[in-house]
């Protein structure tokens, strides 16, 4: 855990707009960035649990193919990459 001095320095850097916690982008303080990072991590884990490992991997594969001008599905089609969207369904 960071000491009080380190926390204060990190908080000052965060207030200047710097991301000091991985995944804490957008937080205006050290504590806010910690909370954002924790929530984003938990959200991703929940989504993985809902979709299952295979569905989560397929969704990541599709998202990784997206570009500024084309969504991942179109790009995958052009490249001949097979994405099984049936695995995107949440488990009940």
From Swiss-Prot:
Any one GO biological process: acquisition of desiccation tolerance in seed
Location of region: Disordered: 1-92
GO cellular component terms, A-Z: cytosol
Induction behaviour: By abscisic acid (ABA).
Bias (Basic and acidic residues) ranges: 1-18, 37-51
Tissue: Present only in nearly dry and dry seeds.
Superkingdom of origin organism: Eukaryota
Pfam families: LEA_5 (PF00477)
Physiological role: It is thought to provide protection for the cytoplasm during the desiccation stage of embryo development.
PANTHER family registered for this protein in UniProt: EM-LIKE PROTEIN GEA1, EM-LIKE PROTEIN GEA6
Sequence similarity: Belongs to the small hydrophilic plant seed protein family.
The protein, known as: Em-like protein GEA6
Organism: Arabidopsis thaliana (Mouse-ear cress)
Gene: EM6
């Amino acid at each position: 855990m960071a000491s009080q001095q380190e926390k204060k320095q990190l908080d000052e850097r965060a207030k200047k707009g710097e991301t000091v916690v991985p995944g804490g982008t957008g937080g205006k303080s050290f504590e806010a960035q910690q909370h954002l990072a924790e929530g984003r991590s938990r959200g991703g884990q929940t989504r993985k649990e809902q979709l299952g490992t295979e569905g989560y991997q397929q969704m990541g594969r599709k998202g990784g193919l997206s570009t500024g001008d084309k969504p991942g599905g179109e790009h995958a089609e052009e490249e001949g990459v097979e994405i099984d969207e049936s695995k995107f369904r949440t488990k009940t």
